[in-house]
From Swiss-Prot:
PROSITE patterns: IG_LIKE, PROTEIN_KINASE_ATP, PROTEIN_KINASE_DOM, PROTEIN_KINASE_TYR
PANTHER family named among the record's database cross-references: FIBROBLAST GROWTH FACTOR RECEPTOR 1, TYROSINE-PROTEIN KINASE RECEPTOR
Cytoplasmic side: 398-822
Parts of the chain that traverse the membrane: 377-397
GO terms under cellular component: cytoplasmic vesicle; cytosol; glutamatergic synapse; nucleus; perinuclear region of cytoplasm; plasma membrane; postsynapse; receptor complex
Chain's gene name: Fgfr1
E.C. code: 2.7.10.1
Site, as annotated: Mediates interaction with PLCG1 and SHB: 766
Catalytic activity: L-tyrosyl-[protein] + ATP = O-phospho-L-tyrosyl-[protein] + ADP + H(+)
GO molecular function: ATP binding; cell adhesion molecule binding; fibroblast growth factor binding; fibroblast growth factor receptor activity; heparin binding; identical protein binding; protein homodimerization activity; protein tyrosine kinase activity
The UniProt record lists the keyword Hydrolase: no
Name the UniProt record assigns to this protein: Fibroblast growth factor receptor 1
Biological source species: Rattus norvegicus
Length: 822
């Protein structure tokens, strides 16, 4: 009996030993789960939940193996394996994968598959087709399960958030996403530039889709630029992510091709040729390369269009950089001919052509001067010549600049004024002031420019000015108010002047007062005096900013001028764009009245009248633009900053010999390239101002680099007709932009033409701005503002004028009102 039991004991022991020593079974190739499984059980588990997997077993199972993604599953502090069951505590997204339970028995092996996804994210990351109703609903997550543990917020798809800078064209839709999760379900809020972002902070608002952790902004505009931060938080933590948005303005032009490209080529037979075509365009251009060919001996077809062969066209994955270059390999005589780069967009087409000439290959001849000795001699001679030229140029420049230097104490305060006012220290004045007034040099009376209550200007010594009874206003009759702005050396404040009109000594008038800043220099003081004296000399006119008075005695210099309550013309027009098409930076602002065509023509007419008067006084403005035209409470146009112009009483042009900061988008070619300023160059600027008026404050040639603008002007490029401008007015602009200055109209002729057009234009002829101005006209305002006389627009030459003063503009104070003919 005991022998039988002993034998049975040893049999069981041997069997158990063999089973234990058997190596872990591997899946047969045909049963590998990484092929196409027959049956897979899918499980979605939330982070922090308990993951339980149970394998179905047969009665005769001898061994069980667990694998995840083809790798043996091992136990850990969170993972427990008990035969046919696997438990994973506090599951995390890294626990996701394809689990396999492999069982072995005498009858064969069997595999059970489990597809596990540990995530709170939705099955699809896209929400393009989500209902808009989801924008007001919080993301619903089952956080009430008893086995859920608290989890701080975390990103569920960080790889989709790697792109932080998003540059998009205006009018596009922008969507930012911050897919995340946590327990309990976290909240989502958005900041713009570090401050709370609310729907009423932008025109059109925005949508937040909590189900997909996203924010959507339709029809973005330049004011939407900034940093957008999503903050995801619950009681156990907080995370944030910042996106940067840059909105690019659209250029209302057909493609612009760089001058001189493609260039003509002359090559030898068998050479390689490369044609280059540089294209500037927004919207996206379509580029093609064509070769002109002959058909039956003719280059022109029956439709009067040239025969051509398409050599290269843009594909789905072809970039603009690739399309801008045409490569020809191993050219033959048949390759000679005319090649054209054709670029088009939704606005129009542009093309440039070049010729390829193929010559016989030249026989190589031994070079005569290729030895190192000859090359060394050439290099030394060339270097010596260049150095000599540089030294000579410096010497000549020094000699010329030395002869042109003038002492500050004797410089004139205005340009060739009838009476000059030199600034002097400690001057002696004759007892008979009238004698000195008639002597041709007006001496300065002892009167400090700094009062006892105001510190002396940092860069200005103690100077004295004469009192002019015609313009002098006692300081106690001037009440200074709030600042209106400041510029390069001065500032402007709103003030109330009492008794400007001698006949009404108690009448209070709102005025603007120009004064120096505390860090002004002697040069700045001279410029302010120069402007004041120029305004005295020019006199008064309804359509210019007039001098009203000055405070020159016993304190700082105050220059009192007319106050224009509605700001400059550019901002005035932008504020009155029709609803839905303007891009106003004040979301609460809505225009109350739409401008008519007659209003716009009246603007141009009044500016032309003001310029006609300045021209009659032999003054050249040099910086005529909508930003330098101010609008009064009664909608009267007044030209500003003409006091900075040069007097040309004895010569009919003004040539600037030193480089400076120039408003190149408004400048005539002769002023831009030769620094020659005339009344005709002001007429060119008036043409650009007309274009600004009929685009309601648009920015000329936006986004065009300075060097490209130079080339475009030399090639005869002119801006296109605004959408709501008549052909007659556009032809007036083109006449103002004539390349030959003498062929441009005079301001007198412009006044006569505009007077006639105003009379013929109906008051009810309102602008139809329902056309797509966001693509075809500059209805996007230039966000940059000007504080200097030359302005701060997108195309400028960036060296400051050494002798051009720079006073601030009046800030815009928007008010509605139609324009009447003045």
């Amino acid at each position: 009996m005991w022998g039988w039991r002993g034998l049975l004991f040893w049999a069981v022991l041997v069997t158990a030993t063999l089973c234990t020593a058997r190596p872990a079974p591997t899946l047969p190739e045909q049963a590998q789960p990484w092929g196409v499984p027959v049956e897979v059980e899918s499980l979605l588990v939330h982070p922090g939940d308990l993951l339980q997997l149970r394998c179905r077993l047969r009665d005769d199972v001898q061994s069980i193996n667990w694998l995840r993604d083809g790798v043996q599953l091992a136990e850990s502090n969170r993972t427990r394996i008990t035969g046919e069951e696997v438990e994973v505590r506090d599951s995390i997204p890294a626990d996701s994968g394809l689990y396999a339970c492999v069982t072995n028995s005498p009858s064969g092996s069997d595999t059970t598959y489990f597809s596990v996804n540990v995530s709170d994210a939705l099955p699809s990351s896209e929400d393009d087709d989500d209902d808009d109703d989801s924008s007001s609903e919080e993301k619903e997550t089952d956080n009430t399960k008893p086995n859920r543990r608290p989890v701080a917020p975390y990103w569920t798809s960080p790889e989709k958030m790697e792109k932080k800078l998003h540059a998009v064209p205006a009018a596009k839709t922008v969507k930012f996403k911050c897919p995340s999760s946590g327990t309990p379900s976290p909240t989502l809020r958005w900041l713009k530039n570090g401050k709370e972002f609310k729907p009423d902070h932008r025109i059109g608002g925005y949508k937040v889709r909590y189900a997909t952790w996203s924010i959507i902004m339709d029809s973005v505009v330049p004011s939407d630029k900034g940093n957008y931060t999503c903050i995801v938080e619950n009681e156990y933590g907080s995370i944030n992510h910042t996106y940067q948005l840059d909105v690019v303005e659209r250029s209302p032009h057909r493609p612009i091709l760089q001058a001189g490209l493609p260039a003509n080529k002359t090559v030898a037979l068998g050479s390689n040729v490369e044609f280059m075509c540089k294209v500037y365009s927004d919207p996206q251009p379509h580029i093609q390369w064509l070769k002109h060919i002959e058909v039956n001996g003719s280059k022109i077809g029956p439709d009067n269009l040239p025969y051509d062969q398409i050599l290269k066209t843009a594909g789905v994955n072809t970039t603009d950089k690739e399309m801008e270059v045409l490569h020809l390999r191993n050219v033959s005589f048949e390759d000679a001919g005319e090649y054209t780069c054709l670029a088009g967009n939704s606005i129009g087409l542009s093309h440039h052509s070049a010729w390829l000439t193929v010559l016989e290959a030249l026989e190589e001849r031994p070079a005569v001067m290729t030895s190192p000795l000859y090359l060394e001699i050439i290099i030394y001679c060339t270097g010596a010549f260049l150095i000599s030229c540089m030294v000579g140029s410096v010497i000549i420049y020094k000699m010329k600049s030395g002869t042109k230097k003038s002492d500050f104490h004797s410089q004139m305060a205005v340009h060739k004024l009838a009476k000059s006012i030199p600034l002097r220290r400690q001057v002696t004045v004759s007892a008979d002031s009238s004698a000195s007034m008639n002597s041709g040099v007006l001496l300065v009376r002892p009167s400090r420019l700094s009062s006892s209550g105001t510190p002396m200007l940092a860069g200005v010594s103690e100077y004295e000015l004469p009192e002019d009874p015609r313009w002098e206003l006692p300081r106690d009759r001037l009440v200074l108010g709030k600042p209106l702005g400041e510029g390069c050396f001065g500032q402007v404040v709103l003030a109330e002047a009492i008794g400007l009109d001698k006949d009404k000594p108690n009448r209070v008038t709102k005025v603007a007062v120009k004064m120096l800043k505390s860090d002004a220099t002697e040069k700045d003081l001279s410029d302010l005096i120069s402007e004041m004296e120029m305004m005295k000399m020019i006199g008064k006119h309804k359509n210019i900013i007039n001098l009203l008075g000055a405070c020159t005695q016993d304190g700082p210099l105050y220059v009192i001028v007319e106050y224009a309550s509605k700001g400059n013309l550019r901002e005035y027009l932008q504020a009155r764009r029709p609803p839905g098409l303007e891009y106003c930076y004040n979301p609460s602002h809505n225009p109350e009245e739409q401008l008519s065509s007659k209003d716009l023509v009246s603007c141009a007419y009044q500016v032309a009248r003001g310029m006609e008067y300045l021209a009659s006084k032999k003054c050249i403005h040099r910086d005529l633009a909508a930003r330098n035209v101010l609008v009064t409470e009664d909608n009267v146009m007044k030209i500003a900053d003409f006091g900075l112009a040069r007097d040309i009483h004895h010569i009919d042009y003004y040539k600037k010999t030193t480089n400076g900061r120039l408003p190149v988008k408004w400048m005539a070619p002769e002023a831009l390239f030769d620094r020659i300023y005339t009344h005709q160059s002001d007429v060119w600027s008036f043409g650009v101002l007309l274009w600004e008026i009929f685009t309601l404050g648009g920015s000329p040639n936006p986004g065009v680099p300075v060097e490209e603008l130079f080339k475009l002007l030399k090639e005869g490029h002119r801006m296109d007709k605004p959408s709501n401008c008549t052909n007659e007015l556009y032809m007036m602009m083109r006449d103002c932009w004539n390349a030959v200055p003498s062929q441009r109209p005079t301001f007198k002729q412009l006044v006569e033409d505009l007077d006639r057009i105003v009379a013929l234009t109906s008051n009810q002829e309102y602008l139809d701005l329902s056309m797509p101005l966001d693509q075809d006209s500059p209805s996007f305002p230039d966000t940059r503002s000007s504080t200097c006389s030359s302005g701060e627009d997108s195309v400028f030459s960036h060296e400051p004028f050494p002798e051009e003063p720079c006073l601030p503009r009046h800030p815009t104070q928007l008010a509605n009102g139609g324009l009447n003919r003045r």
